[in-house]
Amino acid sequence: MTDLDLCAAQYSAIAGDLDANLQRHLQVMRLAAEQRIDFLLFPELSLTGYEPSLARELAQATDTALLQPVRTLAKQLRMTTVVGLPLRTAESDAILIGSALCGADGSQAIYTKQHLHAGEERVFSPGTGGAPLHLGDERIALSICADFTHASHARAAVERGAGIYATSVLISENGYPHDSELLEGYARELSLGVLMANHGGPSGGWSCAGRSAFWAPGGRQVVSAVGTGDCLVIARRRQGIWQGQTLELSLDN
């Protein structure tokens, strides 16, 4: 089993400010690369904040030039990076909650949220998911928030050969106990490594819980952020054993 370094970027988005969030994402990427991270995961809609009322205005095409700096830096740093943003499809006027996967090899793939929370359907349409990504000899399946509330979604990841389940979320203080129990259960029952990246501060009127985390296959919580705030939550696999650390971040405004 090869060494692997995963990181959840717990991040506090600036509401609706794509340019400012993009620059801060690049800053987080550079800081993560200093820790020799292989795979960096940002929260749900990290480039805009969770702002449904602004989503139609902020939605980007899947081939948007906005992501070019992320793609370029991911390749330069040799660090596969997943960022969140609202997406507009070429086929329709539908707005999707998306993740853009910028590979260490310069490639890009798109994952779109398949399962919506109650009320999200007023703005967003269900997406179609996406294929697991290959990282060395590991397969990583992506998820966006409500996707993981459907056990069939996690089981499908395992059936497609994934050993890591990486979910970009917005989880509130009230929702955290239930949601973290679900994720721990997938790690325990499906022998998945589960990486969860949550918002580090309020977004879209929600009081986010922070506490981004990683659970090793078997269900042991390896590492968790203490609470809210911007930080890196790192899980490292060495000779099959997982260890964790957290690093607080002080980002430029």
Regions found by a protein language model. Give the residues of each.
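Short polar catalytic/cofactor-binding loops
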Residues: 10-15
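Cys-nucleophile CN-hydrolase/nitrilase-fold catalytic domain and related Cys-dependent amidase chemistry
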Residues: 18, 26-104, 172-192
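Extreme N-terminal starter segment of soluble prokaryotic enzymes
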Residues: 2-8
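Active-site catalytic loop in hydrolytic enzyme cores
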Residues: 90-163, 173-175, 179-181, 238-253
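Short beta->alpha transition motifs characteristic of CBS
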Residues: 48, 55, 100, 111-117, ...
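CN hydrolase (nitrilase-like) catalytic-core segments centered on the catalytic cysteine
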Residues: 65-82, 149-231
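Short beta-strand scaffold segments in enzyme catalytic cores
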Residues: 83-85, 97-101, 131, 212-214, ...
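Short, acidic/polar
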Residues: 20-29, 148-155
